[in-house]
Amino acid sequence: MQPLEVTLKRYLFRLINGFRSGTQYSPSQLPIDSFSRILIIRQHDQLGDLLIATPTLRAVRRKFPNAFIAVVVREYTASVVENNPYVDEIIVFYEKLWRWNIRKLILFWKMLRNDFGCTIVLNTISRSLSSDIIALLSGSKYIVGPDHLMLDPSLPEKIYNVPIRWPSVQKHEIQCNLDIVRALGADENDFEYDLVLTDGEVNEAERIYQSLGIPPGKTVVGVHFGALNPSKCFPLEKLVTVIDWMIEKFNVEIVLIISRNEIERRKIVLSTVHHKLHSAPVMPLRIMAAFLRHMSLVLCNDTGTLHITASQRVPTISFHSLSDPVIWKPPHPRHIAVRANDWLITSITIEQVQEAVITAMKQFVEKPAS
């Protein structure tokens, strides 16, 4: 966070503390059996962060099978939890001020003030003041959150009146989210993500895939090369070398998968690669998720696309820089992370990627051609 942002958040935190009771509850003091309406807030992060939290949504539902469960998310991540069987209602928080109007404000307030007995704030890496304010505005008597993200350590914690002790050992982000609700007796051993698609979305993705003219029976590898942060983008010249090598060694069909921000980068790939590639059109998130089901393997950077692909149980090879894959990579064995020792994306070698491809093809796809 920038210094000005930190100062502002600390000021607001102090202001809130001045008006809120300091009464705290341990998880054992909670009337858990009476929680018939539960609010879960995970609105301050990116697509991948929300998908990582879906096992926690599943855990809460299984602990409270008859409860009404609502989740607060950002507008651009809301489609991740559409059709989720463990969520009854999606409450959208608009990040941009200009996206709000009177009708949206009234609806947001009405949905938020819905007699929630317990609010759970899934803060893990950083503390979101907007999430804290939403939790307070919900009117819940009990607000559950981690105890390690104090904006001002000199003040007592008054927003999370059910503070959950944070573990001192390093864990995967899925485990970190689950730790917050384990105190309520909710747990989950299945770490697969939930992104549940409709038949219409699957059919539209099928139509798009068929339009590419890929011969039946061929092994199809998807390649997504974008990221908003340039430090997370595997160099295109190295990626092109890997693509040509994969086609020659494994006789695969390569499909380039892009967003609107990656059209120019796709032109660079197509102008430098030595083999014919297929290009998928820009697709909405959920259609893209359905489209990814047609891939035998996906190569991508450490972005939301990695986690979207994982949600459809498709093997991946992902390129990582500053974010530790031990913490952030989908934890399932079918996902292989590639990272340089100096954590620089530009230091990842072609040989590292080729080794990962060979492993993935042997273990999850098919044996290499002789």
Question: Which residues does each predicted region cover?
Answer:
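Catalytic machinery of carbohydrate-active enzymes
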Residues: 1-370
